[in-house]
Amino acid sequence: PAGYTAAEKAAAGGLSTVLFEKNALGGVCLNEGCVPTKTLLYSAKVYDTIKHAPKYAVSAENPAFDFPKIIARKNKVVKKLTAGIRMKMKENGVEVVGGEAEIKGRAADGTISIASGEAVYEAANLLICTGSETVIPPIPGLSETEYWTSREALLSKELPASLVIIGGGVIGMEFASFFNSMGTVSYTHLRAHETLR
């Protein structure tokens, strides 16, 4: 979340600040990474706890989950946090511009021209925080299949019967844990010899 955090600090320090964002505020972490996966994991944890309730002398017959409602809850959490960031930007006087920004050049006095849509902005300083992109491994035949990235996994409306997760990083392991708890037969394929390197 470097972009909006830096914008907030700059504005709090008295700088006139503009934040350009073509997607939802909060970046990958809030919208497609750690926050939504942790929300899904919490639902899985509650479900697992209820399934094992008799072990703790607690009666909980026929535990069940509603997958679309789990996804809806995740979306609600993300939306609430995104709205919170937007409110913080407004409170701190950060102008949020939705859309792409293009650096047009630098004047002789060092001022940087930045265009977004029809508007042009002038700035003394520029911080570029482009976030991250999903890396698609060069696996033969992968491009001919309907594979998921973490983005599609978070948007899924139906629980898959089985799933192969390529990657042993945090997000991959969180998805493996979540889908396994929900009853999906989950396999992980690691490039390295250990998970969570």
Show which residues each predicted segment covers.
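Glycine-rich flavin
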Residues: E8-A161, R191
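Glycine-rich nucleotide phosphate-binding loop and flanking beta-alpha elements
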Residues: G3, G26, T134-V135, I171-G172, ...
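Glycine-rich Rossmann-fold phosphate-binding loop(s) that bind the pyrophosphate
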Residues: P1, K22, G168-G169
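N-terminal Rossmann-like FAD-binding beta1-loop-alpha1 element of flavoenzymes
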Residues: P1-V18, F175-N180
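Conserved small/polar residues in nucleotide/adenosyl-binding loops
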Residues: T188-T195
